């Protein structure tokens, strides 16, 4: 491989490839499509790469850790992982995120219902073993007109309580640790937030019969996102290596809208947003979309996205073919099957899954290993540990898998 040039936020340095790299060096090396000492791992470095609360609490019990669990996202019930857990897993990434507003918070209507800061109502939905998620119960813009958008009580993107003290915290983390940092400004969704506020069926109908409303709503969300993201990146942009954004654009079988519709409506919005982001930070752009988005990857690259997550293998299929087709232009982040192997497979099955994804996606860098989306409550602790241990076992460069 030879010596590698390491770039982080515009600063270059060289290091000997025979030495063990720091997590930050390791991640940035694969983002440069070069081979580090080993494949980096992300578990807990973001809102789509963590563990759902019940599964996380079982993992902590298995590890003998009794700390209080902190919730990252109420709807998806994702946990902030303790530092001790992340060190045991060997995660190379840490999250730098905006804080909850001190002026505006979700409102509990009763023990089973709440409204979020956008005015969307959610209702508790139980499933096995007493676990629950929150299902969309009411969309506040379901019957709105374009004129109504101007009168709607939007969250205030200039609310600086969301970043109070964040610059100092991010600098301390950057200077005193060697992890790769993923920035998440909190407001970063367009399509998902739009249809959540409008209702999915109505929004899909609007794509055909009411483009004026769709355009007006997306423009409003762009305005809010830019206004909120600016202060966040002013605070942390120099310290992060990755900036996370995303929208679920597909199901397991195909896109939620035609590629033409995406290119006409959403792509220009994202281009404006990401142009703004890149004016504030040198961090690489991480884009999360579940489902089969193969037909849009070229479009994502065109607007500056260089990281694709979660690499939903149950939808995308042959990961070796994905690497051949897109691997020179994007870094794949995720890829370990959360839908079938992690919940239902044995430790040996998990190890085989990790080995396969590293074999397919790891050559020449461009791969950060991790689960496909958040690890769910039905994944046994031994399989989470098997995932982490297998990445270290099989991920050493030069790869031999």
Task: Name every feature range the model reports, one short phrase each.
Residues 52-97:
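Segments that shape or occlude catalytic/ligand-binding pockets
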Residues 98-113:
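Short acidic, Pro/Gly- and aromatic-enriched capping/linker segments at domain boundaries
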Residues 93, 101-103, 315, 375:
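Glycine-rich nucleotide phosphate-binding loop and flanking beta-alpha elements
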Residues 78-85, 110, 114, 162-169:
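Generic hydrophobic, aliphatic-rich segments that mediate packing or membrane embedding
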Residues 2, 7, 15-60, 65-69, ...:
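Active-site loop segments of alpha/beta catalytic cores
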């Amino acid at each position: 491989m030879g010596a590698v040039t390491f770039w982080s936020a515009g600063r270059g340095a060289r290091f000997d490839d025979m030495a063990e790299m720091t997590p930050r060096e390791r991640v940035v090396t694969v983002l440069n499509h070069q081979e580090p000492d080993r494949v980096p791992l992300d578990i807990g470095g973001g809102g789509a790469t963590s563990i759902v609360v019940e599964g996380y609490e079982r993992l902590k019990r298995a590890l003998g850790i009794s700390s209080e669990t902190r919730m990252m996202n109420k709807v998806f019930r994702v946990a902030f992982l303790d530092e001790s857990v992340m060190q045991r897993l060997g995660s190379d990434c840490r999250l730098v995120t905006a804080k909850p507003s001190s002026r505006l918070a979700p409102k509990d209507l009763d023990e089973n219902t709440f409204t979020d800061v956008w005015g969307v109502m959610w209702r508790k939905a139980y499933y096995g073993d007493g676990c629950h998620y929150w299902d969309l119960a009411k969309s506040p813009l379901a019957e709105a007109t374009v004129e109504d958008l101007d009168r709607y009580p939007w969250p205030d993107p200039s609310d600086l309580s969301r970043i109070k003290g964040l610059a100092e915290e991010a600098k301390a983390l950057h200077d005193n640790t060697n992890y790769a940092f993923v920035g998440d400004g909190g407001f970063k969704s367009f399509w998902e937030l739009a249809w959540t506020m409008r209702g999915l069926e109505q929004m899909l109908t609007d794509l055909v019969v009411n483009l004026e409303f769709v355009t007006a709503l997306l423009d409003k969300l762009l305005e809010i996102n830019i206004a909120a993201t600016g202060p966040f990146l002013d605070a942390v942009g120099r310290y992060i290596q990755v900036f996370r954004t995303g929208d679920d654009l597909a199901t397991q079988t195909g896109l939620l809208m035609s590629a033409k519709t995406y290119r006409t409506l959403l792509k220009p919005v994202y281009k404006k947003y990401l142009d703004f982001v890149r004016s504030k930070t040198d961090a690489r752009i991480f884009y999360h979309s579940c489902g089969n988005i193969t037909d849009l990857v070229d479009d994502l690259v065109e607007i500056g996205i260089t990281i694709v997550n979660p690499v939903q293998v149950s939808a995308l299929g042959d990961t070796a073919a994905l690497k051949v087709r897109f691997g020179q232009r994007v870094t794949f982040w995720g890829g370990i099957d959360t839908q079938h192997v992690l919940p239902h497979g044995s430790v040996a099955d998990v190890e085989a899954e990790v080995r396969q994804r590293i074999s397919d996606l790891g050559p020449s860098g461009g791969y950060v290993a991790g689960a496909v989306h958040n690890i769910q409550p039905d994944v046994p602790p031994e399989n989470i540990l098997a995932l982490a241990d297998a990445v270290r076992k099989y991920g050493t460069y030069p790869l031999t898998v």
